[in-house]
Swiss-Prot record:
GO terms for molecular function: NADH dehydrogenase activity; oxidoreductase activity, acting on NAD(P)H, quinone or similar compound as acceptor; quinone binding. It is a multi-pass membrane protein. The chain crosses the membrane at residues 30-50, 98-118, 127-147, 165-185, 203-223, 248-268, 300-320, 336-356. This is NAD(P)H-quinone oxidoreductase subunit 1, chloroplastic. It comes from Nicotiana sylvestris (Wood tobacco). It is an enzyme of class 7 (translocase). Pfam families: NADHdh. GO terms for biological process: aerobic respiration; photosynthesis, light reaction. Keywords: Chloroplast, Membrane, NAD, NADP, Plastid, Plastoquinone, Quinone, Thylakoid, Translocase, Transmembrane, Transmembrane helix. It is found in: Plastid, Chloroplast thylakoid membrane. Its main location: plastid. One of its GO terms (cellular component) is chloroplast thylakoid membrane.
Amino acid sequence: MIIDTTEIETINSFSKLESLKEVYGIIWMLFPILTLVLGITIGVLVIVWLEREISAGIQQRIGPEYAGPLGILQALADGTKLLLKENLIPSTGDTRLFSIGPSIAVISIFLSYSVIPFGDHLVLADLSIGVFFWIAISSIAPVGLLMSGYGSNNKYSFLGGLRAAAQSISYEIPLALCVLSISLLSNSLSTVDIVEAQSKYGFWGWNLWRQPIGFIVFLISSLAECERLPFDLPEAEEELVAGYQTEYSGIKFGLFYIASYLNLLVSSLFVTVLYLGGWNLSIPYIFVPELFGINKRGKVFGTLIGIFITLAKTYLFLFIPIATRWTLPRLRMDQLLNLGWKFLLPISLGNLLLTTSSQLLSL
């Protein structure tokens, strides 16, 4: 069978078209991920700037003001400085554990953002077990911290890693029990379903009013998970120099710095999703699109409003951990463990039993 030149050109053009479709498919698949990473990076820079400005206001001093207007580029300048610093590795430590520890901490926190809905079904992965996926993934981060402390071959680093692991285990259980109580109220483990379950009664439908005890326990546990004051024992400067970060410099130290703020942002986002109604606005906004001549059928305006509401609630809530840093003194290690095991765990367990009983009685 003889194939002429025209048929060969047709086959080649068809194969090129299929290759282009594959390339476009890969780009379209990576676009949401890259957009989320870019948004998270900008969000972390905003948190750093807010913390410095709020801290300066609390201490009645002037915050950063030279790096860009109002000092908004100060965090970017600090990151550039860390990138240009020398990356030192301890000669007597475990090089592999020392190098892989920061990466595990950052990647595990980054994966948590994949189940957070920023708008109406605007989520990277709408999993049916979204909240438990977050708990499972976030529990990997302390493993990276422990590896960093052990791989540094430094007593201060090792003690900091052990403290981080003990603290995470102590407060992960009350956190999970509070999340389970919310899931029982919403009859779902999906983050999207939990937000939609709070949209029935507007402001009064938030889980904050139905789970006030769980909200307080969740707030304390999330502060401990983020290692924020008064729970920053793994890196207490007066006791452990810098904890598991003592031997780190350059980009690896910058990864730990980013991981702490990534964890703070993801905790605040989950507070918004689980307790503050997510993307739902508490006041009617049905007539706003018609007022400005915007067609709501395209859902563009509604999506932008949802993203704005979610981020506004998140950054308003961030004022609490930032203000707490300059308000409360650091706990001792025995006080921290007693608070987690003797108080928060029984309270969260009792809250779960009450929630289960109320749900059974309502059947």
